[in-house]
Amino acid sequence: MNISRRAILGVRRPRRRIAAAIVGLLAGCTFAFLLQLDTAMPPGGWELGVAVFAAGLVVAVYAGWARGGAFPGVGSVLLPLLWVAILPPVVAYLRGREYSGSRYSTIRLSDALHTTGTELELAIETVPYLLVGALLFGGAAFFVGAGARRLSGR
């Protein structure tokens, strides 16, 4: 494997750990969201969406530190961003108007009198902006991890 491919795709073992961490994180957060455990968080505590994004950034730093690859590092930020933007409207769309109140931990577009279908369409339209955000934040987090590894002498 040449050096540029290794930098982009990473080493196999850390790449698998990154994938397992993100899949586990999103699965756990999905269950917490569906069971409405995110509404039981203490006042002033982090909302579930912010916590998922922060965990994705931590995984991206780990990707840089463990030579997991830039692509898995950026992906570890993109997937939580997609989760935060798309899962609540999908749940609202599938359940109908049952969740039209202030149930969500993300900003509700239905507060601006959108239907659940329109809310889902608008969430899907934000995907290119989420990709740009993931490239910026995930890339920066990856380079922080890679720089920390280089500074530590490993």
Residue ranges and their predicted role:
Residues A54-Y62, L131-G145:
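Hydrophobic cores of alpha-helical transmembrane segments in multi-pass inner/ER membrane proteins
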Residues L26-L34, P80-A92:
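Aromatic-anchored segments of alpha-helical transmembrane domains
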Residues R12-A20, A32-A55, I124, Y129:
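Transmembrane alpha-helix entry/boundary detector in multi-pass membrane proteins
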Residues M1, I22-L26, A70-V84, H114-A140:
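Hydrophobic alpha-helical transmembrane segments
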Residues M1-F33, G147-R154:
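Haloarchaeal acidic low-complexity proteome signature biased toward cell-envelope/secretome components but also
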Residues E47-L78:
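Canonical alpha-helical transmembrane segments
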Residues W83-A112:
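Juxtamembrane non-transmembrane "cap" segments at the membrane-aqueous interface
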